[in-house]
Amino acid sequence: RNAIRVVGSRGEMGAGHMADAYARARKGLGCFITSTGPGAANAPGALVEARFAASPVIHLTGQTATANMDKEQGAVHDVMDQLGMLKSTSKSAYRIRAPEMALGVLMKAAREALTPPMGPVSVEIPIDVQRAKITRPAMLDNLVIAPPAGDAGNARSLDALADMAASAKRPMLWCGAGARYAGAAVQRLVDMGFGVVTSVNGRAVIPETHPMTLGAFQATPEVEKFYETVDFMLI
């Protein structure tokens, strides 16, 4: 309480893009909130962009009272199958059906958003659940939700890959969005003589002013011709 900085936006889609940008810039979890119904329906454009960019984002939205959900009874902003809409544009979407489920669902959503391939996860919270009072979980005092540990890989395969890289005369890195979280490793390979090209979402893994990068121009005819001169490419 009183430790969350709330930044307002002019619309729900803008809020989603702001959360996406925060996740990319801070290399952490972004979050935005929308109202139910039309408010939630304004979010999918931003959710699709975050999903395309593999940005870990939590989208919290409302829902009509649990007794009225999915019945088309004319409750305010009761959109039929709102959860289905969010599932189609998010990595996953969940509904908190009871107050005691809230922390567990939110933790699951955060972990899923942070699990590669990262992406946005939506969570519906019905209005009566929002208003309910529960005992504050003690685990909140020391709660840390970290990305899951990466796969260490097969040692023999990694050794073979290292041998190939060491013997290469013209090695190249092709970095996508996931490489944003491995900037130090990318820089080390660049310092060893690797050239770099990135996808649009992999931009800024290293500064595009660096003499060893071709930036995000990975599909131009000139660069594709250049690939033919490369004897080792790590993607």
Give the location of each predicted region.
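N-terminal alpha/beta PP-like core and its mobile active-site loop of ThDP/TPP-dependent enzymes
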Residues: R1-I235
